[in-house]
């Protein structure tokens, strides 16, 4: 059986390493090339012993035949590489934010750089399979969604599409420390992060325009007001988002739950739960657990959603997108359930 060839540009970050872990056991795809400038010349399994079956050399550039290239570089660093990869006939999945926003001006405003290839922004497909499956299937370039937006959008989009709520939402999200990457900072070292919870980038987080853009599309072009407040919590993985939105008209708790169940009934990686979910339910999996509830006294909808920020929020969703692009079963390589404890 022919296997597709995959390559990872910048395997050494958390998202790149998680991609390597998932792809190693993928039945239809072979990970054949990985890059990492600071570790070029070393073997992946030597530097990261937990990836003991991956004896791949880490190189400066992708080598050999590659059908699908995953970019796991920080924002701004990978965008300029994409045209050359596409010219070589590769399908490209970018895990950074470089192709998520459609308006080039937003990159200057929110990310502080002028986009090097704005002509590709319209072509790039926003890779949230639950909303864009058909577009992803025919795409050359997929912009993998951010971790916070994945959790927030999946939690709110059924309510927006069903016209249940006013075009406004408050999103309170809490993330494990891996969401800040592998490079240590004062905020993320153990002595500072342990037994501590803090809010950050209040009203200025770069995922805010991404959430607003996709909720606008889901609501038929109505631009929503999105208030987004992220927090760091002392755990390694996981995001739990709690979204609040005003109901347009009275609706029962069961009616809302049924709307959500019907919306996601055919989705392999979204489960509407009977009780508020825990982040540990998603650890190491590509699942998103969602719990909608009506606050009847205040005429509010409250939606809790949680994901593993490195899997459904990054590498797992990227593999899900790859499966769709290659015409494979969407769940291939992503069937793992969480571990407990």
Swiss-Prot record:
Query: Does Transmembrane helix show up as a keyword for this record?
Result: no
The molecular function terms of the Gene Ontology recorded here are: N-acetyl-gamma-glutamyl-phosphate reductase activity; NAD binding; NADP+ binding
Q: Which reaction does it catalyse?
A: N-acetyl-L-glutamate 5-semialdehyde + phosphate + NADP(+) = N-acetyl-L-glutamyl 5-phosphate + NADPH + H(+)
**EC primary class:** oxidoreductase
Q: What is its main location?
A: cytoplasm
- The active site is formed by 147
Q: Which EC number(s) does the record attach to this protein?
A: 1.2.1.38
Q: In the UniProt record, does the keyword Metal-binding occur?
A: no
The compartments listed are: Cytoplasm
Keywords, sorted A to Z: Amino-acid biosynthesis, Arginine biosynthesis, Cytoplasm, NADP, Oxidoreductase
Q: Name one GO cellular component term.
A: cytoplasm
Question: Its GO biological process terms?
Answer: L-arginine biosynthetic process
Hey, which pathway is this one from? Amino-acid biosynthesis; L-arginine biosynthesis; N(2)-acetyl-L-ornithine from L-glutamate: step 3/4
- What the protein does? Catalyzes the NADPH-dependent reduction of N-acetyl-5-glutamyl phosphate to yield N-acetyl-L-glutamate 5-semialdehyde.
Give the record's family classification. Belongs to the NAGSA dehydrogenase family. Type 1 subfamily.
Q: Which HAMAP family match?
A: ArgC_type1
Q: Which NCBIfam families does the UniProt entry name for this protein?
A: argC
Q: Kindly provide the name given to this protein in its UniProt entry.
A: N-acetyl-gamma-glutamyl-phosphate reductase
């Amino acid at each position: 059986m022919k296997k597709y060839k995959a390559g990872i540009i910048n395997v050494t970050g958390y998202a790149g390493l998680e991609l390597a872990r998932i792809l190693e056991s993928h039945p239809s795809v072979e990970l054949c090339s990985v890059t990492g400038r600071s570790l070029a010349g070393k073997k992946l399994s030597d530097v990261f012993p937990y990836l003991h079956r991956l004896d791949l050399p880490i190189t400066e550039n992708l080598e050999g035949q590659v059908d699908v290239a995953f970019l796991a570089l920080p924002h701004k660093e990978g965008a300029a590489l994409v045209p050359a990869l596409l010219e070589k006939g590769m399908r490209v999945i970018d895990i950074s934010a470089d192709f998520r926003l459609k308006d080039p001006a937003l990159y200057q405003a929110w990310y502080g750089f002028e986009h090097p290839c704005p002509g590709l922004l319209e072509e790039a497909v926003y890779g949230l399979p639950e909303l864009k499956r058909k577009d992803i299937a025919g795409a050359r370039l997929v912009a993998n969604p951010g971790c916070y937006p994945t959790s927030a959008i999946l939690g709110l989009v059924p309510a927006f599409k069903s016209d249940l709520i006013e075009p406004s939402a408050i999103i309170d999200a809490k993330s494990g420390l891996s969401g800040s990457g592998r490079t240590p900072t004062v905020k993320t070292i153990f002595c500072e992060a342990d037994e501590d919870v803090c809010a950050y980038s209040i009203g200025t987080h770069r995922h805010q325009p991404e959430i607003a853009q996709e909720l606008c599309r889901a609501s038929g072009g109505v631009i929503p007001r999105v208030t987004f407040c992220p927090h760091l919590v002392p755990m390694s993985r996981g995001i739990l988002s709690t979204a609040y939105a005003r109901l347009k008209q009275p609706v029962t708790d069961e009616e809302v739950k049924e709307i959500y169940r019907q919306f996601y009934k055919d989705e392999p990686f979204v489960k509407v739960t009977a009780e508020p979910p825990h982040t540990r339910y998603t650890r190491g999996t590509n699942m998103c657990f969602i719990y909608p509830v009506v606050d009847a006294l205040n005429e509010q909808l409250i939606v809790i959603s949680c994901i593993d920020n490195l899997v459904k929020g990054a590498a797992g969703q990227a593999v899900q997108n790859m499966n769709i692009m290659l015409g494979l079963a969407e769940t291939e390589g992503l069937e793992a359930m969480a571990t407990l404890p």
